[in-house]
Curated annotation (Swiss-Prot):
EC number: 2.7.7.6
Function statement: DNA-dependent RNA polymerase (RNAP) catalyzes the transcription of DNA into RNA using the four ribonucleoside triphosphates as substrates.
Binding of Zn(2+), residues: C7, C10, C44, C45
Protein name per UniProt: DNA-directed RNA polymerase subunit Rpo10
Subcellular location: Cytoplasm
Annotated InterPro entries: RNA_pol_su_RPB10 (IPR023580), RNA_pol_suN_Zn-BS (IPR020789), RPABC5/Rpb10 (IPR000268)
Entry's cofactor comment: Binds 1 zinc ion.
Length: 66
C-alpha cells in the first residue's frame, strides 16, 4: 500500500528512497544499481523496496464517505 518509513527488520530509514528508486527503475535502470547508488546496502532494506506493491490507488475506492 504505502511504502513503510522504516525497514521492518533493522529500522533503517527507507521511505525517502522510494520516489527516486521508482523513478529511476521506471526509466529503465537496473534496480540493483539504483539501490547501490541510493546507499541501500542491507538486504532487508533492499527487500522492502524491491518487493513493495503500490496498490493505494486501488484500495482508496473502498473507503467510507465522511
Amino acid at each position: 500500500m504505502i511504502i513503510p518509513i522504516r525497514c521492518f527488520t533493522c529500522g533503517s530509514l527507507i521511505g525517502d528512497k522510494w520516489e527516486p528508486f521508482i523513478t529511476r527503475v521506471s526509466n529503465g535502470e537496473d534496480p540493483g544499481k539504483v539501490l547501490d547508488d541510493l546507499g541501500v546496502k542491507r538486504y532487508c532494506c533492499r527487500r522492502m523496496l524491491l518487493s513493495h506493491v503500490d496498490i493505494i490507488k486501488e484500495v482508496i475506492h473502498y473507503t467510507r464517505p465522511i
